[in-house]
Design a protein with these regions (language model features):
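Intrinsically disordered, low-complexity linker/terminal regions across diverse proteins
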Residues: 1-281
Length: 281
């Protein structure tokens, strides 16, 4: 749906994404931090003072694009639009996102989905405003951006219909960026999975499930959560991510391979008519 000129700039941005995986090449030195056992408040002050001096030392110096905004042990992943980079610390490269002993379906549905999710952030409603260098700069034709906005509005409208609790619904506008990344992430991970021998195997079953079924079950597994209703009401009003249930069901309900994998038919609870399904990337 994009013109050739906009599509080429999108491809250029995609290939320009910097990948930071595991841990930084240069470690930060904390020798100046004074830590004393039993002095919690004083230790916090020491850390804050060290951080202040660390940030102050950056003044009048070129931006260090090799710097990490998180620690290697943190279980997280993120896309930084200002650096056009995706970051995956060692903390997330473990179960349930990644497991050396697991089959491809499990890993592509786990860490594969997360990788695809962060890549898609480069082209969500916010990332789309940054160029390949991380500058806020328009690289769209007017017509293409209008098409993009129309597609994102369909995502907003769909997620507004998802019920969280009684009369509480997902806030489609608030969660647009993350929903775009969830849908794109699953699509990217699935396409990559289908390039593997296991992904092309439609016969072999493990624990009674086909490879495609295990792929989608792996996605569901990484978002397992148990929350109180009061917390969920607060979450829906403040968090830019959809509730875990809709981070799984929402994208799957728009994914044609999911319908085929589980033989989902009209009348089934999670069936979504084709004209209601959304796809941007």
């Amino acid at each position: 749906w994009m013109s050739d000129s906009t599509k080429q700039k999108a491809i250029d941005k995609l290939y320009a994404i910097t990948k930071k995986i595991g841990y930084p090449d240069k470690w930060r030195n904390y020798d100046q931090v004074q830590i004393d056992k039993g002095k919690y408040f004083e230790n916090l002050l020491s850390l804050d003072q060290n951080q202040y001096q660390y940030e102050l030392a950056k003044l009048n110096k070129p931006v260090d694009r090799t710097e990490w905004e998180t620690t290697p042990s943190t279980v997280t992943a993120y896309y930084n639009p200002s650096f056009n980079e995706i970051v995956f610390p060692a903390g997330i490269l473990q179960f349930p996102y990644f497991d050396f002993a697991a089959d491809d379906a499990i890993n592509y549905g786990g860490i594969g989905m997360v990788i695809g999710h962060e890549m898609t952030h480069a082209f969500d409603d916010q990332g789309a405003q940054f160029d390949k260098y991380g500058n806020v700069k328009n690289w769209w034709t007017k017509e293409d951006y209008e098409k993009f906005r129309a597609k994102t509005q369909r995502v907003v409208d769909l997620y507004n219909t998802f019920t969280v609790l009684d009369t509480v619904h997902v806030k489609g506008a608030l969660t647009l960026g993350e929903n775009t990344a969830d849908n794109g992430g699953i699509a990217i991970a699935y396409d990559a999975f289908k390039m593997t021998p296991e992904g092309q195997d439609t016969v072999t079953r493990i624990n009674g499930f086909t490879s495609d079924q295990r792929f989608y079950l792996s996605i569901a597994r990484i978002w397992r959560v148990k929350t109180r209703d009061a917390y969920m009401r607060m979450y829906v009003n403040t968090n830019p991510h959809s509730p875990a249930k809709w981070r799984v069901n929402g994208p799957c309900m728009s994914a044609a391979p999911w319908y085929k994998a589980f033989n989902v038919q009209p009348g089934d609870s999670n069936y979504l008519p084709e004209d209601k399904r959304v796809k941007i990337w």
